[in-house]
A protein has these predicted regions:
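Non-heme Fe(II)/2-oxoglutarate
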Residues: 1-84
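Conserved active-site beta-strand element of glycosyltransferases/polysaccharide synthases
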Residues: 97
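A short coil-to-beta-strand element that immediately follows conserved catalytic motifs
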Residues: 85-94
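A short, polar/charged loop/turn motif at coil->beta-strand junctions and beta-hairpin connectors
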Residues: 4-5, 89, 155
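Catalytic core of non-heme Fe(II) oxygenases with the double-stranded beta-helix
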Residues: 100-159
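A residue-level signal for beta-strand positions that form part of recognition/binding surfaces
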Residues: 7-8, 92, 127
């Protein structure tokens, strides 16, 4: 299975367990700290700190452009280039800390997601759906993938 023929690819062990666990714990700690600061008026709401108001999954913490996630995106760039054969330019990162009962509904990503990466850093397994042909294809239910998504573009899935 190659990216060039299937328009998606699952890449096993793209991120080490230790790195994934470190980033997961960082993001969960950030979520809790930001929640505390907002609740106790220690810091005003700021997109750089994250939000619970994303319309795709309200009341679930997410952050656009988190510095650690941006760093991970740059670190994964050589892997993405190697597997796609494309000269890619990183555009943005977006992270979400799913909680029990959350479901990311079928949606279309913005044009800058033409080539994108879906990565689960920990938690329960969820299937990922990719609709590059007009049908629902369950790609993998491996323990390190959990973001169900059906974007308009193509994906490389890092595990």
């Amino acid at each position: 299975m190659t990216f060039q023929t299937n328009k998606y690819q699952v890449i096993k062990n793209a991120v080490s367990y230790d790195l994934a666990n470190f980033i997961l714990n960082y993001f969960l700690l950030k979520r809790d700290a930001v929640g505390f600061m907002y609740k106790h008026n220690i810091h005003s709401q700021s997109s750089i700190l994250g939000t619970w108001t994303d319309q795709q999954i309200p009341n679930t913490y997410s952050c656009y452009g988190d510095f650690v996630m941006e760093t991970l995106m740059v670190k994964m760039l050589p892997v993405m280039k190697q597997h796609t054969g494309l000269d890619l330019i990183p555009t943005y990162s977006y992270a979400r800390a799913y909680k029990k009962g959350d479901e990311l509904k079928r949606h279309k990503d913005r044009p800058s997601c033409e080539i994108s990466t879906t990565l689960n850093l920990g938690g329960d397994p969820w299937p990922i759906f990719i609709d590059g042909t007009g049908s629902n294809n369950v790609i993998d239910e491996y323990k390190n993938i959990h973001k169900p998504n059906a974007p308009a573009g193509t994906k490389v899935l890092l595990e």
